[in-house]
Amino acid sequence: SLVGSEMCIRDRYGNIFLENRYTDWGNYYPYRTLRNLWMLSRYVPAEKMQIEFLNKWRNADKYSTTDPFAPARYSFDYLFAITLAAQPLAWMEASNLPEEAYATATLLKEYQPLQLQFHQGIILPIGEEPSGRSWTGFQSIVSDTQGYLIIYREDNDIAKRTIDTWLPEGKKVTFTPLMGNGKKFVAEVGVQGKVSFELNDKNSFTLYQYQVKP
């Protein structure tokens, strides 16, 4: 099978590079990159995949000014954040970035000490399939009682959304934000791991550490 072949390739060669996408061709769409990772992460360890983020300022004229999913409509922080469950790949020449891009270095420094811990867990997709309009994300299950969640609010008008996770039904869980725009909260997990998350801004994210209470 294709998945079996991919697993063999991974075990033999290490990280997997999925595909070239370039703003030159107008075929780099951040939500599609996120969707590829989300769909494959059920079958291939996310931490083995190299997922690209590009210079959103380059070739902006290749996209329609009315295209809601054009790279220029996203923050550079968000473009980096969609790669966090995988191996982030800066698919660009850093020398061509504008000065404002370097503010994302702060986010990178925040993530570096967390990456190994996040990747030690079993990483699975949660929420809805990324479509550019969804609430979606990933869960890293480090143990029965702790792990991490990355929650993404794509371009939609819903500031609070209940999504399915892999958390145990009926348990109380503490969610502590480590990166992004979320707030600390405690919730009781519903049927099918349902938990409500809140993000005030479109195309925003939060990386939470979670702890399941006894």
Model-derived features: positions:
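Solvent-exposed beta-hairpin/edge-strand motifs
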Residues: 166-183
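Aromatic/acidic polysaccharide-binding cleft in carbohydrate-active enzymes
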Residues: 10-112, 151-153
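Short, flexible beta-strand-to-coil junctions
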Residues: 9, 153-156, 178-180, 211-214
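Short, small-residue-biased leader/transition segments that mark boundaries at the very start
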Residues: 2-9
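Carbohydrate-binding surface patches
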Residues: 129-171, 205-211
